[in-house]
Amino acid sequence: MSFSVEVLARIAIELQTGIGHQDRFQRLISTLRHVLDCDASALLRYEGRQFIPLAIDGLAHDVLGRRFTLEGHPRLETIARAGDVVRFPADSDLPDPYDGLIPGQESLKVHACIGLPLFAGQNLIGALTLDGLEPDQFDTFSDEELRLIAALASGALNNALLIEQLESQNIMPGSPVAFEHVAHTEMIGLSPGMMQLKKEIEIVAASDLNVLIGGETGTGKELVAKSIHEASPRAVNPLVYLNCAALPESVAESELFGHVKGAFTGAISNRSGKFEMADNGTLFLDEIGELSLALQAKLLRVLQYGDIQRVGDDRSLRVDVRVLAATNRDLREEVLAGNFRADLFHRLSVFPLSVPPLRERGEDVVLLAGFFCEQCRLKMGLSRVVLSPGARSHLLSYGWPGNVRELEHAIHRAVVLARAARLGDDVVIHARHFALHDEAAPAVAQELPAIANENLREATEAFQRQMITRALDQNGRSWAACARALEMDVANLHRLAKRLGLKG
């Protein structure tokens, strides 16, 4: 089989139609999957030694949230280094990053795999991956035909990257024209609320306005602050962080503004405060609503006049600091209650941002779950960590009162539990590995630190013993019934139990 002119024209047309780059990329991937008759296709962007999925077809939705590092995925590293079409043999020992991620075929391994690196000049900017479940699925397509596909995709991706950078430079006039991508903090999410937030971040980052970031606990307000700073003209200067809720009143003023030697007992030398450290940069004040009224007055003066006084010093110091503040409180209500100064509130909230709670972000839950699964896979040295369809449905049906932080902890705990239930480094997370109850949500966060402080092998074995013992008790001490409950082969269960000291 070879590509006809009509097929190539169709691919080119798909790259010119659609609203926005994302739509065009999705049309490209869907068309390629149909034309090449493959089981899965993906367009990936290369950034900071990792591949970031931009569009997928035939793969689980959580793939869009995963970040595939070169170190963790040898096939993708091979594609990145190749410079040309890569065909992996059906019996390749290199694990495929999409094994277990093709819906309806979770238990099957990917057999046929082609990688097309995408270049802008000599620079790698991305890759196309084509996967099939039959070993000879792509044998009828020549390398020359695949290079034509790669050339079309490279042009489309490069144009999108150039437009993205030009738009950013138009917002910030005077920036040097340089088309070299710099990795920034990434906010994962494609829901309308998150897309709107990203747009607002892009707008306000280019200015020097103070920003008040509101949102529930665990939504990612610090990540928003980092994104604003990194996209701002101040990005080359420091971003200094201060948690106002953790400041004892006795040292709060010194932490903010510094002190001179002898200002108080224990002040044995001059010390710069956070404002001085952030000079020409950005100061992020987390939990701003916890500051006392006295400190609020002094903070207001800095915002008004741009000068500070160290504790114990009569001299003023000029500082040039952009302030980003975050709170999980309703500061308007705090103003009405007399707990927060109205003038400070108006100074801080020149451009307010609101981070949506996870329960309002729809499918973003699955993307974030994929991101955390990939993190766990790398940290624990596993070959793969995938979510079963039931697990995805379970995550989508939960309300997430603890937001993204709770999801992260829940995924980490589920990975440990899922690994304990089976042999090997292939981990499949099922709904039963989650204990998601609104009233019990804090318990997830409380349990994880204890696990993290233990030796990983010992913690895993302890979970395995606990689960096997419980399953035996619930199944009348029948090893066969226990194996069925744990979804294990009974012979493997006997071997595992013997290794764990549960059998003689």
Swiss-Prot record:
InterPro entries linked to this entry: AAA+_ATPase (IPR003593), GAF (IPR003018), GAF-like_dom_sf (IPR029016), Homeodomain-like_sf (IPR009057), NorR (IPR023944), P-loop_NTPase (IPR027417), Sigma_54_int (IPR002078), Sigma_54_int_dom_ATP-bd_1 (IPR025662)
Gene Ontology molecular function: ATP binding; ATP hydrolysis activity; DNA binding; DNA-binding transcription factor activity
DNA-binding region(s), residue ranges: 479-498
Pathways per UniProt: Nitrogen metabolism; nitric oxide reduction
GO biological process, one term: phosphorelay signal transduction system
Sites of 4-aspartylphosphate modification: 57
Domain of life: Bacteria
Binding site for ATP: 215-222, 278-287
Residue ranges of every copy of the Sigma-54 factor interaction domain listed in the record: 187-416
Gene3D superfamilies: 1.10.8.60, 3.30.450.40, Homeodomain-like, P-loop containing nucleotide triphosphate hydrolases
Keywords noted in UniProt: ATP-binding, DNA-binding, Nucleotide-binding, Phosphoprotein, Transcription, Transcription regulation
Function: Required for the expression of anaerobic nitric oxide (NO) reductase, acts as a transcriptional activator for at least the norVW operon. Activation also requires sigma-54.
HAMAP family: NorR (MF_01314)
Record's protein name: Anaerobic nitric oxide reductase transcription regulator NorR
Originating species: Enterobacter sp. (strain 638)
Lineage: Bacteria, Pseudomonadati, Pseudomonadota, Gammaproteobacteria, Enterobacterales
